[in-house]
């Protein structure tokens, strides 16, 4: 077995399959593109779904990749086991209807055992297979595997409900008896017992059948197109090749661990548990790559995952004795380890560090706040006579505030509390089950559409034409290819001026005419067929026949509106980079007829000043009437030109580069204006957050922009009339004057309210009642608003009238409740929570004063009557 670095292992895998005629697919972003079923890219095949379901046919049916992936359903196991990671790399080879079982097995055995490649000892490799899959067994024997090393496993069958399915075969490496102290041997593999001896390094899925849950598996029909999907974990391979005890004892993690040693003053040892070192090293990799790909910490979705990873890493840093912020300082090390294949971490190093540093600073403040929450919780439990900290409370502090369980338990035990360990485990298990349930299990192979996949005719889109003569080559109705269609159908022509929806640009609409110029069909939508042809969805008015020529004519006004928005999107993208920063990566776009929508990554709301500058800059470029040039070239030349690839686009060998003066240059397959002046005008109408770390700008161009400005002008004129400003230029001064007058009136009103409260107070406060050793006042009062209750409470505080004050008032349709306390035995916040339900309300506050709001005025008498009972 050869000695290799992780970079060499990755490259050798890719080189091997390249030598076998595979195209190397680049690693895609961890943030899925156009796939709502996935929170993260979680496997090597996840980015290739479109090929497996037949919606797109690849130029080469043989593919290979090294794909970064994230899985977070078992975060708690990271650091505890030898091989659990949140971010990992999957090496894979794939066949889309090309080779199958024979070649896949031969390739795997050659790569692993040949002296030209990894040169693993054959006697160290064991293979599992599906018992009924005798063909796979025979293929392994053919390539030279010892039959005693072939282990049948009933679970070796891949299927998720109805659809493509098939047996899989897994390759394991035997690390020897040193990792099998009980000498269990092959039983570990045969009975799927968790162990450190037999390490799975490669899984080959043979997508062969069309699963149908209503029939036995043995009767599943075969798929028309059989596929191969394999996955090899890079971290595991490197661990075996480099002789590491765990995946962390390799060149993928050890440089990070060495930096953690420097920061903590502690020493890492492969023979010790070292959980904190492992957690930090794993989590900083995930954070660096995910943030680099545009995901940002937040309170939901991907953002929540990143926030949780960061907080877990910080707490393990504290366990190692690291004081202050430290995580961001590890990012350059991550970048250097991975730079040979993933240069983006170093390229975005400053931005990644900025986000991590800011998030860590926020969490350190959260830790301080969490300490106060625990102190308050324990104090309340003591006042209620309880000596047990419930598991649900421990979990809430952990899950909501990121406060470490061990620290919560330690503080509670110091105060004499018993710990509900079982309750915490139940709450944690429930959360893990929710997390697993939230993961939509999407496999590599979706349903195959044979009809569309079978269309292989040549079809060309004519960028510059608005109308053209096209020959009807294929017509589809009710999912069948027919010679003549009427009603709703899908059509493919040899040439077409109709743009198929792609890259955020909506499809062209229009008409199809016959030789006499009569409209015979309306084009309602255009999409790409699996082999790339423009597939026209039409409603026919007269029958259309294959082989005949027709005039294809797009809706020119619709196209003109769409291209204005598309070109403006390029200008907006460039302006965002100039003003907000290069981290503002495109996260989606839509170029419609009426508007454009642009989603981008950014960690804060775009300020009004920034929006104004973006709008000004885009309009400046529009008015310069810059030429919009389109160049067709190869991908390498395009990148040398500095062209920026747009989010979610798949580019072939030849690409189109859209260049707008020296202001913008992007790879883009869409249609555009000829000059920027054709856009006319650009106006941002909305900026909003649509998810953790993702912002959205909606804008309009041309006539719609003029209408938006006109609407704003009309609104300003109406405001001028309302505030009696002679001219719109005087509206601001007039509104400011009115605000000053309002503030004066409010001060006078507050003063009158105070006097009113003082005049009422003698009557309200004279009815003092007793509950045990406490004196209290409980009264319904008439006040204009909640401030009236506070004014009365202020007067009560200045006098020695009672220990507790409870005031309730009906204000409009609502009920307001105030509780104040001078007694250390009564917490106002607790009492208000007990009383609020009488008026269908809720609230809270501090020990000395708390308030609540409700909606059930009929419950006021019952509330007042209950005060004595609650205080007794």
Swiss-Prot record:
Keywords in alphabetical order: Aminoacyl-tRNA synthetase, ATP-binding, Cytoplasm, Ligase, Metal-binding, Nucleotide-binding, Protein biosynthesis, RNA-binding, tRNA-binding, Zinc
The record's annotation in PROSITE patterns points to: AA_TRNA_LIGASE_II_ALA (PS50860)
What the entry lists under Pfam families is as follows: DHHA1, tRNA-synt_2c, tRNA_SAD
Q: Which InterPro entries match?
A: aa-tRNA-synth_II, aa-tRNA-synth_II/BPL/LPL, Ala-tRNA-lgiase_IIc, Ala-tRNA-ligase_IIc_anticod-bd, Ala-tRNA-synth_IIc_core, Ala-tRNA-synth_IIc_N, Ala-tRNA_ligase, Ala_tRNA_ligase_euk/bac
Subcellular location field: Cytoplasm
Instruction: Give a yes or no for keyword Transport in this entry.
Output: no
Give the principal location in a single coarse category.
cytoplasm
What's a Gene Ontology MF term here? zinc ion binding
User: What's in the GO CC field?
Assistant: cytosol
Per UniProt, Zn(2+) binds at 566, 570, 668, 672
Reaction(s) catalysed by this chain's protein? tRNA(Ala) + L-alanine + ATP = L-alanyl-tRNA(Ala) + AMP + diphosphate
Which cofactors, by name? Answer: Zn(2+)
Entry EC no(s): 6.1.1.7
> Could you tell me which CDD domains the record lists for this protein?
AlaRS_core
> Which GO biological-process labels does this protein carry?
alanyl-tRNA aminoacylation
Q: How is the cofactor bound?
A: Binds 1 zinc ion per subunit.
Note the Gene3D superfamilies from the entry: 2.40.30.130, 3.10.310.40, 3.30.54.20, 6.10.250.550, Bira Bifunctional Protein, Domain 2, Threonyl-trna Synthetase, Chain A, domain 2
User: Which family, according to the similarity comment?
Assistant: Belongs to the class-II aminoacyl-tRNA synthetase family.
Q: What does this protein do?
A: Catalyzes the attachment of alanine to tRNA(Ala) in a two-step reaction: alanine is first activated by ATP to form Ala-AMP and then transferred to the acceptor end of tRNA(Ala). Also edits incorrectly charged Ser-tRNA(Ala) and Gly-tRNA(Ala) via its editing domain.
Which NCBIfam families does the entry mention? alaS
Protein's name in the database = Alanine--tRNA ligase
């Amino acid at each position: 077995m050869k000695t290799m670095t992780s970079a060499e292992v990755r490259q050798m895998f890719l080189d091997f399959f390249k030598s076998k005629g595979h195209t190397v697919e680049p690693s895609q972003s961890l943030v899925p593109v156009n796939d709502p079923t996935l929170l993260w890219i979680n496997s090597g095949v996840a980015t290739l779904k479109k090929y497996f379901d037949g919606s797109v046919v690849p130029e080469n049916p043989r593919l290979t990749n090294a794909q970064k992936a994230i899985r977070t359903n078992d975060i708690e196991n990271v650091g505890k086991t030898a091989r659990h990671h949140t971010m990992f790399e999957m090496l894979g080879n794939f066949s889309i209807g090309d080779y199958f079982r024979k070649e896949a097995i031969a390739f795997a055995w050659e790569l692993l055992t040949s002296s030209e490649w990894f040169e693993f000892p054959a006697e160290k490799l064991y293979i599992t297979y599906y018992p009924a899959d005798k063909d796979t067994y025979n293929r392994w024997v053919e390539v030279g595997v010892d039959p005693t090393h072939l282990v049948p496993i009933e679970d070796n069958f891949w299927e998720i409900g109805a659809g493509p399915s098939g047996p899989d075969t897994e390759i394991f490496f035997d690390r020897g008896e040193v990792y099998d102290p009980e000498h269990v041997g092959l039983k570990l593999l045969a009975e799927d017992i968790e162990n450190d001896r037999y390490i799975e390094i490669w899984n080959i899925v043979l997508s062969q059948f069309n699963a149908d849950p209503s029939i036995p598996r043995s009767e599943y029909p075969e798929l028309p197109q059989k596929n191969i999907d394999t996955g090899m974990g890079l971290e595991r391979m490197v661990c075996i090749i480099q002789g590491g005890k765990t995946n962390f004892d390799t060149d993928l993690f050890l440089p990070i661990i060495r930096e953690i040693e420097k920061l903590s003053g502690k020493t890492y040892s492969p023979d010790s548990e070292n959980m904190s070192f492992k957690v930090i090293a794993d989590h900083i990799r995930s954070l660096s790559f995910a943030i680099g790909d545009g995901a940002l910490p937040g309170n939901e979705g991907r953002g929540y995952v990143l926030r949780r990873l960061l907080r877990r890493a910080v707490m393990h840093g504290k366990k190692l004795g690291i004081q202050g912020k430290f995580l961001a300082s590890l990012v350059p090390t991550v970048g250097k380890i991975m730079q040979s294949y993933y240069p983006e971490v170093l390229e975005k190093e400053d931005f990644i560090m900025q986000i991590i540093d800011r998030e860590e600073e926020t969490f350190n403040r959260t830790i301080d706040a969490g300490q106060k929450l625990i102190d308050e919780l324990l104090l309340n439990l003591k006042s209620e006579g309880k000596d047990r900290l419930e598991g649900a409370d421990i979990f809430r502090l952990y899950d909501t505030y990121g406060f470490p369980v061990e620290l919560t338990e330690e503080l509670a035990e110091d105060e004499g509390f018993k710990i509900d360990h079982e309750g915490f485990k139940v709450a944690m298990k429930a959360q893990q089950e929710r997390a697993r349930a939230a993961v939509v299990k999407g496999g590599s192979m979706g349903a195959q559409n044979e009809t569309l996949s079978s269309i292989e005719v040549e079809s060309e889109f004519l960028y510059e034409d608005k109308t053209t003569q096209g020959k009807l080559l294929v017509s589809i109705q009710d999912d069948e290819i027919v010679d003549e269609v009427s009603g709703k159908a899908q059509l493919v022509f040899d040439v077409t001026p109709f743009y198929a929806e792609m890259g955020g640009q909506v499809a062209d609409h229009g008409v199809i005419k016959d030789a006499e110029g009569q409209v015979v069909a309306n084009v309602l939508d255009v999409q790409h067929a699996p082999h790339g042809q423009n597939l026209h969805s039409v409603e026919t008015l007269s029958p259309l026949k294959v082989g005949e020529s027709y005039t294809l004519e797009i809706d020119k006004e619709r196209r003109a509106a769409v291209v204005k928005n598309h070109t403006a999107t390029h200008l907006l993208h460039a302006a965002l980079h100039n003003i907000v920063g290069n981290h503002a990566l495109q996260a989606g776009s839509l170029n419609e007829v009426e508007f454009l929508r642009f989603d981008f990554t950014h960690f804060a709301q775009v300020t009004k000043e920034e929006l104004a500058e973006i709008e000004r800059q885009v309009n400046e470029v529009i008015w310069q009437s810059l030429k919009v040039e389109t160049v067709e070239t190869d991908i390498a030349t395009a990148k040398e030109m500095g062209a920026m690839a747009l989010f979610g686009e798949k580019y072939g060998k030849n690409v189109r580069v859209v260049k707008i003066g020296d202001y913008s240059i992007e790879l883009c397959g869409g249609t555009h204006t000829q000059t920027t002046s054709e856009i006319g005008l650009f106006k941002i109408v909305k900026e909003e957050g649509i998810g953790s770390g993702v912002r959205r700008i909606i804008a309009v161009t041309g006539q719609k922009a003029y209408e938006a400005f006109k609407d704003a002008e009309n609104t300003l004129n109406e405001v001028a009339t309302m505030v009696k400003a002679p001219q719109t230029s005087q509206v601001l001064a007039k509104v400011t004057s009115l605000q000053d007058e309002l503030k004066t009136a409010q001060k006078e009103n507050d003063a009158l309210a105070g006097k009113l409260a003082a005049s009422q107070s003698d009557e309200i406060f004279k009815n003092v009642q007793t509950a045990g050793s406490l004196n209290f006042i409980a009264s319904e009062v008439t006040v204009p608003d909640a401030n009236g209750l506070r004014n009365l409470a202020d007067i009560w505080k200045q006098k020695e009238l009672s220990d507790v004050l409870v005031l309730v008032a009906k204000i409009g349709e609502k009920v307001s409740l105030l509780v104040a306390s001078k007694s250390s035995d009564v917490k106002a916040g607790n009492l208000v929570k007990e009383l609020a339900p009488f008026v269908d309300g809720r609230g809270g506050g501090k020990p000395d004063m708390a308030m609540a709001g409700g909606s059930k005025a009929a419950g006021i008498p019952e509330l007042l009557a209950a005060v004595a009972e609650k205080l007794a």
